[in-house]
Swiss-Prot record:
Cofactor comment text: Binds 1 zinc ion per subunit.
Designated name of the protein: Threonine--tRNA ligase
Binding-site residues for Zn(2+), renumbered to this chain: 291, 343, 467
Protein species of origin: Methanococcus maripaludis (strain C5 / ATCC BAA-1333)
CDD domains per record: ThrRS_anticodon
Subcellular location: Cytoplasm
Lineage: Archaea, Methanobacteriati, Methanobacteriota, Methanomada group, Methanococci
């Protein structure tokens, strides 16, 4: 089902002429003021479970109506929203059921199905006044949940003022990243923002990083040598970061038995779509994070206060989430992904809050290292926030001092998840949409559920557990890096990855055959110094070789001709210091070039180039 929801000053219609599928009705005209107008197209997929799509549609309409504080709803059949319409009979039944379900709490006007109608509408024109929704037949877990309506604030870390978010606040926001994150949280969609394919999808194919695997399930990728190298370097980076901060690496299974009550309850609490299947008499699931294995491991440990805070870390290769096919978007949303996952056992809330703060700064450091600045949102239950305001304001103040930015604060009236507090950090893609990456969460449920205890003398203490992904999934990190590379082109800079992550850091290009031997010696020296360098020995023109190096995003392009051989000074194009139409060139000795590249990558992880040194024998994967 496709819907378009318009917050309207009024909607007025008049049925003019029947079609052959028109319903018989006496309601041939009508008008409703101060209403939510819901244009609806019933689709073929809805026929598989009409009850579910009715329930999901009503839930969405109620949520929107309550947010807008309206009590009048117009249900308006509008076939033009879809090219895959369901049968007229099913559409009539579904529309009538939606009207029936809404009528108990709202004044409902339903326009007739199958008539040519004239209508007039006046849209209010505020940020939430036009919303489009795709309603599916997915049946959500039948768990009675109290409706939770959050309040959102902007926290100014300089004067520690909280400003509740409203239309005026949104209209005056200057921080584009924070505004994008806030609009995502408030479900504010902008026309034209979601059109087309994100640039990173083009890049992953064009640069031979990765691609969809057609013989697997949707949302699963094949990784080519360059992409595998980038993933491995990112994995090395997180490993080093976590171990430096006291994390102990472990490895746990990817599959779990849902007959274990703790695992089943935690899986249900998480709420994301999961890969579940039956094998023999067992109901099994593929993990969506490393929580399950790490919690079972902690349950079996004899933990003492002196062990706290205890940090276990796993690079979960892979984690699985059964996302809807229509929601799969390149590396941003997929079904199999690599998640760095650390869980910290803390003896009490005081220690948990200290660890939370440490891990917040660790997460923010990753944005600095990747050169992908984050917008952040803190989320707390109301009770937790009121008890710990000063602690929060201290973090907000330090964040403002370090980054010069405000943050979003979400206050939940009650706890609806296993956590009482969390922080999410996001980069913004080229469409102005957030890519949520690092997160830290304060979990107050899982220790009890899994039977994790700390032995404190004669007492058994149930600890607090922090969930932390210092970077978010490796795939999303790469997504953010590639989207950021595209955004650089809008500022007249060539797209590039940080040098330590670029597969080919340097390429040596001889002008002619007589320069080839010297050029090969230079490439060999670079590789001996731990630099990923190759040598372009192909039978192409000089111009094409230089263009190919640009297409490959090579950070340092070394051209060797007569003058370079005579002077031993190499002509080097430095990509990250260049403009789109103006290359930045330097004259460097081999030793100076090695020193410059080594200084560029600093203490970042290093791996050799997993391709032949000679370009002529490097295979083409796409």
């Amino acid at each position: 089902m496709k819907t378009l929801l318009i917050h309207s000053d009024y909607l007025e219609f008049e049925a003019k002429e029947k079609t052959k599928i028109a319903e018989d009705t006496d309601v041939l005209n009508g008008k409703m003021d101060e209403c939510l107008t819901v244009f609806i197209a019933v689709e073929k997929d809805d026929e598989s479970d009409p009850d579910a799509v009715v329930k999901n549609a009503v839930d969405e309409i109620v949520k929107t109506a309550d947010n807008l504080k309206v009590k009048n709803v117009v249900v308006y059949p509008y076939a033009h929203l879809s090219s895959d319409l369901g049968s007229p009979a099913t559409a009539k039944e579904i529309l009538a059921e939606i009207e029936k379900e809404l009528s108990g709490d709202y004044e409902v006007l339903r326009a007739p199905f199958g008539w040519y109608k004239a209508f007039k509408i006046s849209c209010k024109g505020h940020p939430l006044s036009e919303l489009s929704r795709k309603i599916t037949t997915e049946r959500k877990e039948e768990v009675k949940k109290e409706k939770v309506v959050s309040k959102f604030y902007i926290i100014n870390g300089e004067n520690l003022e909280l400003t509740e978010v409203n239309d005026e606040v949104i209209s005056k926001m200057e921080d584009k990243g924070l505004l994008a994150l806030l609009k995502h949280e408030l479900d504010i969609k902008e026309e034209g923002k979601d059109n087309g394919e994100p640039p990173h999808v083009k890049y992953i194919k064009e640069k031979e990083i990765c691609d969809y695997e057609p013989s697997s399930d949707a949302g699963h990728f094949r990784w080519y040598p360059k992409g595998k190298l980038i993933r491995d370097l990112l994995s090395d980076y997180v490993y080093n970061l976590v171990v430096e901060n006291g994390g102990m690496p472990v490895e746990t299974p990817v599959m779990y038995d849902l007959q274990n009550n703790a695992i089943r309850e935690h899986a249900d609490k998480f709420g994301e779509r999961q890969y579940r299947f039956k094998q023999g008499n067992k109901d099994l699931m593929l993990r969506f994070a490393a929580c399950f294995g790490q919690f079972m491991m902690k349950k079996d440990m004899y933990l003492l206060p002196k062990h706290m805070p205890l940090k276990l870390y796993e690079l979960s290769t892979y984690s699985f989430r059964y996302e809807q096919r229509g929601e799969l978007v390149g590396l941003k949303r997929l079904r199999a992904f690599t998640m760095p996952d650390m869980h910290t056992v803390c003896i009490d809330m005081k220690q948990a809050m200290e660890a939370f703060e440490d891990q917040l700064w660790m997460g923010l450091k990753t944005g600095d290292d990747f050169k992908t600045p984050y917008a952040i949102i803190f989320r707390f239950t109301e009770d937790f926030f009121e008890e710990n305001k000063e602690w929060f304001f201290g973090m907000a103040k330090e964040y403002k001092q370090k980054y010069g930015k405000d943050a979003i604060l979400e206050i939940l009236p009650g706890r609806k998840h296993y956590w009482v507090g969390k922080v999410d950090m996001a980069v913004v893609d080229s469409f102005g949409r957030p890519i949520e990456n690092p997160t830290v969460q304060i979990d107050v449920e899982s220790a009890e559920r899994f039977g994790i205890v700390v032995h404190d003398g004669d007492k058994k203490v149930q600890p607090i557990i922090l969930h932390c992904s210092p970077t978010g999934s490796v795939e999303r990190v790469l997504c953010g890096l590639l989207e950021n590379a595209y955004l650089n082109t809008l500022e007249n800079k060539p797209p590039a990855l940080p040098t330590w992550l670029t597969p080919i850091q340097a390429r040596v290009i001889p002008v002619g055959d007589k320069h080839a031997e010297f050029a090969l010696e230079v490439a060999t020296k670079l590789r001996a110094s731990g630099i990923r360098a190759d040598f372009d020995d192909r039978e192409d023109s000089m111009g094409k070789k230089v263009r190919n190096a640009g297409t490959d995003w090579v950070n340092y392009v070394v051209v060797i001709g007569d003058s370079e051989m005579e002077s031993s000074k190499l002509t080097v194009t430095v990509r990250e210091e260049s403009e789109l139409k103006k290359a930045k060139k330097e004259s460097l000795t081999v030793e100076e070039l090695i020193e410059k590249i080594t200084s560029d990558v600093k203490d970042a992880p290093k791996r050799p180039l997993p391709l032949p040194m000679k370009c002529s024998v490097q295979p083409i994967f796409r």
